[in-house]
Design a protein with these regions (language model features):
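Short beta-strand His + acidic residue motifs that chelate non-heme Fe in jelly-roll/DSBH
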Residues: 63-65, 87-94
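DNA-binding recognition helix and immediately preceding turn/loop
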Residues: 194-217
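Generic protein-terminus/edge-of-domain signal
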Residues: 1-65, 69-71
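Compact structured core domains
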Residues: 136-185, 189
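A cytosolic small-molecule/anion-sensing beta-strand core signal
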Residues: 58, 74, 83
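Histidine-centered metal-chelating micro-motifs
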Residues: 79, 84-90, 109-110
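Short acidic-glycine-tyrosine-enriched beta hairpin
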Residues: 68-80
Length: 217
């Protein structure tokens, strides 16, 4: 199938997503995802998200393209999407998808504290081809947060349900924000170290006889 003939799948609610992957819908506005339990899935498609989505990839089972570049995700990475974003999905043949995550509709958080703060989670609008690489300890933290939300979804809906679900989603996103900041703070430090070493090598070069013998580096 040619790229321009790929189907455009609009994920405008969580039930639509669950039907595409053969998963159960427990709540109309939020769903905890376990793609290892999926019974069907598209192999090549464009996804247009009208919900928030966060995935913890357990294995690389395909490629995800956002804009013109591919995410650099591997095992144990997190990728996030916000309403209005379009991704290009290409699944590896004969490989079961394997990822955990959460989808939630903007209506779930509308009028809540999380709804007022959602834009601070900049990883939802991250426009490069980088995913969040997490440690095993961080992965367990994410899984614990997802489990808390799962337990709440299994509970009979009452007047506390929405507040508790939103609070636990907020907790999950706060942890992810910490992980993102750790990753990029670390990377910035590495970049600075490279620049310092490069400047040191240049100084050594120009302080010796190399410029006269070999010319400019």
């Amino acid at each position: 199938m040619e790229e321009n003939t790929k189907e455009m799948i609009v994920i405008d609610n969580v039930d639509r997503y669950n039907k595409i992957f053969g998963l159960e819908t427990r709540h109309p506005l939020v769903s905890i995802i376990d793609l290892a339990k999926s019974t069907t899935w598209p192999t090549r498609a464009w996804f247009r998200y009208e919900v928030y989505a966060l995935y913890l990839k357990n294995v690389k089972c395909g490629d995800i393209k956002y804009g013109r570049q591919y995410y650099d995700y591997q095992d144990g990475t997190i990728v996030c999407f916000a309403p209005g974003q379009i991704t290009d999905l290409e699944m590896l043949p004969n490989i079961q998808p394997n990822a955990h995550g959460i989808l939630f509709h903007p209506d779930l958080i509308r009028g809540t504290a999380l709804g007022q703060e959602i834009k601070k989670y900049s990883f939802f609008s991250y426009e490069t081809n980088e995913a969040l690489h997490i440690s095993e300890e961080e992965r367990q933290t994410v899984m614990d947060c997802l489990q808390k939300i799962t337990i709440e979804l299994e509970h009979s809906i009452d007047k506390h349900s929405r507040r508790l679900i939103c609070a636990n989603i907020g907790l999950l996103l706060d942890y992810c924000m910490r992980f993102y900041e750790r990753q990029f703070d670390t990377r910035n430090g590495v970049d600075k170290d490279i620049i310092v070493r490069f400047e040191h090598l240049l100084n050594e070069y120009f302080e010796g006889d190399a410029p006269q013998n070999q010319g400019l580096p």
